[in-house]
């Protein structure tokens, strides 16, 4: 299928999805959200894809947030329907079973900032700037996702003030896992993706599910959940076979 608002490409076992509205700073229009959700559905069901990279087109923006002009022009009925669709798309992204790496190539404001908190790993460059704007225009978002990234005290600060976070600070507080020059961003994201894709996809996806499902559980329940998963859902090769395969990949005989 040909998309109007996103680009989709494959590099080995990696899907690279690009929000492609650079003239609008990759603002999240309803159409872009629908296309992104549709492609994510395809990628999730494609066993050849093990990792996803999400980025924005152009040198200025990952995503400037929601498409405000589209919202202003929408009827109440259109707004309600589109809000419901976006809600489901957001949850699909947040609960996506494969790892998603964000290549944060510029500003991520409002809904764009919220989007970054739903990704597993965020790699940014010097142009990255993240700002949670909801309190400034009478809304609330990221209360459920941002504390998992930066911790509750810092999440409160960023959500209450709505202040911008520059790239260096973003890395320091955990909003970015890694900070690289913009000229190296794509390669850095691909290198991380290749490292993940080289591992057993069932284990990687199982670990992600455990991490997400265990949120808020007591420590002992989290321990038991991992043990149960190892016995059942994550049951694969025997430990001996797994270690043997690992050594063979390392060239050890």
Model-derived features: positions:
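Crotonase-fold acyl-CoA enzyme core
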Residues: 94-201
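C-terminal alpha-helix plus adjacent terminal tail
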Residues: 1-12, 59, 162-168, 187, ...
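A general structural signal for well-ordered alpha-helical segments in protein cores
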Residues: 68, 86, 143, 152-155, ...
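Conserved CoA-thioester-binding segment of acyl-CoA-metabolizing enzymes
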Residues: 1-55
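Catalytic-core regions built around general acid/base machinery
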Residues: 39, 85-97, 103
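Terminal peptide-recognition signature
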Residues: 17, 21, 36, 54, ...
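Hydrophobic alpha-helical membrane-association signature
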Residues: 32-35, 82-85, 185, 226
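Glycine- (often His-adjacent) and acidic-residue-rich active-site loop
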Residues: 3, 56-92, 108, 218
């Amino acid at each position: 299928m040909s998309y109007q608002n996103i680009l989709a490409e494959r590099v080995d076992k990696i899907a690279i999805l690009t929000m492609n509205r650079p003239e609008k700073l990759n603002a999240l229009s309803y159409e872009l959200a629908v296309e992104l959700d549709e492609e994510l559905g395809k990628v999730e069901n494609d066993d050849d894809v093990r990792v996803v990279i999400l980025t924005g087109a152009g040198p200025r923006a990952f995503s400037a947030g929601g498409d405000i002009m589209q919202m202003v022009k929408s009827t109440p009925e259109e707004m309600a329907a589109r809000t419901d669709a976006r809600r489901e798309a957001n949850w699909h992204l947040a609960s996506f079973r494969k790892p998603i790496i964000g290549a944060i190539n510029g500003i991520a404001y409002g809904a764009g900032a919220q989007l970054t908190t739903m990704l597993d790993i965020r790699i940014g460059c010097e142009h990255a700037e993240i700002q949670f704007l909801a309190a400034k225009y009478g809304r609330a978002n990221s209360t459920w996702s941002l504390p998992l990234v930066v911790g509750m005290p810092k999440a409160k600060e960023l959500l209450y003030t709505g202040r911008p976070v520059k790239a260096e600070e973003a890395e320091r507080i955990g909003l970015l896992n890694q900070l690289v020059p913009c000229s190296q961003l794509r390669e850095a994201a691909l290198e991380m993706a290749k490292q993940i894709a080289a591992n057993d996809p069932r284990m990687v996806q199982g670990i992600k599910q455990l991490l997400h499902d265990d949120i808020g559980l007591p420590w002992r329940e989290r321990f038991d959940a991992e043990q149960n998963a190892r016995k059942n859902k994550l049951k694969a090769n025997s430990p001996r076979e797994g270690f043997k395969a690992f050594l063979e990949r390392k060239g050890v005989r």
